[in-house]
């Protein structure tokens, strides 16, 4: 494991995922992996519902060179102890901008909740994200001021907890250079992958999950 992402979702984690896969030449773990891979979903669902008391992080992330996005970022302190050589990247974003993106995501997710009754796998995603993210992180409250406070407090905690020689505070608008410096890698010739995961992309991902949900595991 070379990189652990400690930044919340909606801070450019899809762009970071693509960039790290290019620089490290391997797979980078993201929420999308959980949604599309039954074994990953099963592990997180059982963990969230208390069916397993402890997550086997090494087994969960076997085959990945980096991990980013929620719910990974919630457990960065525990995970960084398992992988002491890994660098920690805190993706940051203006708080107001983050809130707008997060709020749009929650609105899109709520509109798709009806599908949860039809697709068992989608229901499992809703159950584990509600427990781990909505309840455990945000205390079941999604008001703007409260969510921004939680977001900013998380970032401050990362800055205090992670040793400076392991931490990169990173805005994806900075492009390749900070990542390449951290990883001691040459700057790629191709443009940095600025991926905008908007409503269309989310609906496409939900659609793919629904299709997978109707397939036999």
Cite the ranges covered by each PLM segment.
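Short His-Asn-centered micro-motif
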Residues: 5-7, 31-32, 68-71, 92-93, ...
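PAPS-dependent sulfotransferase catalytic domain
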Residues: 25-29, 33, 48-61, 74, 77-169, 185
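Short, well-ordered alpha-helical microsegments
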Residues: 13-14, 73-77, 99, 175-179
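PAPS-dependent sulfotransferase catalytic core
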Residues: 1-62
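The conserved 3'-phosphoadenosine-5'-phosphosulfate
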Residues: 33-42, 89-99, 116-117, 153-215
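Gly/lys/ser-thr-rich phosphate-binding loops in alpha/beta enzymes
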Residues: 55-90
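Short active-site oxyanion
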Residues: 1-4, 63-66, 87, 164-168
